Amino acid sequence: MVSQLVTYSAHVILFVLVWLLAYTDVVPVLSYLPECLHCLVNYAPFFAVLFLGIYAVFNVVYGVATFNDCAEAKVELLGEIKEAREELKRKRIID
């Protein structure tokens, strides 16, 4: 199974390669585009980073908004904290 790093790297390398070929006019894509779209090709990496950041922010906000309250996990965690405190008191590390 391919790791996520390899998958993302392949997409990024492909995007950069296509953009670089279009930007340096090795592949004459800009001659077929209207003049108003040339700036989109020139600033495509900036737009890609910008949209990736926007996606990341909305993904985090969505994750926080739909986060479930885990009552069982809270009780379990409080029990583990109590056990740790009792053990530290037995070892006389805390009072």
Swiss-Prot record:
Point out the signal peptide segment.
none
Please report the record's description of how this protein sits within the membrane. Answer: Multi-pass membrane protein
Keywords, alphabetical: Endoplasmic reticulum, Membrane, Transmembrane, Transmembrane helix
Q: Which pathway, metabolic or otherwise, does it act in?
A: Protein modification; protein glycosylation
The record's annotation in InterPro entries points to: DPM3 (IPR013174)
GO CC, any one term: dolichol-phosphate-mannose synthase complex
Question: Pfam families under this entry?
Answer: DPM3 (PF08285)
**Domain of life the protein comes from:** Eukaryota
Q: Where in the cell is it found?
A: Endoplasmic reticulum membrane
Q: Locate the transmembrane regions by residue number.
A: 10-30, 44-64
Q: Does the keyword Transmembrane helix apply?
A: yes
**What processes in GO biological process is this protein linked to?**
GPI anchor biosynthetic process; protein glycosylation
**Carries keyword Lipid biosynthesis?**
no
The entry's family comment says:
Belongs to the DPM3 family.
Describe the function of this protein: Stabilizer subunit of the dolichol-phosphate-mannose synthase complex.
Q: What is the name of this protein?
A: Probable dolichol-phosphate mannosyltransferase subunit 3
**In the UniProt record, what gene is named as encoding this protein?**
dpm-3
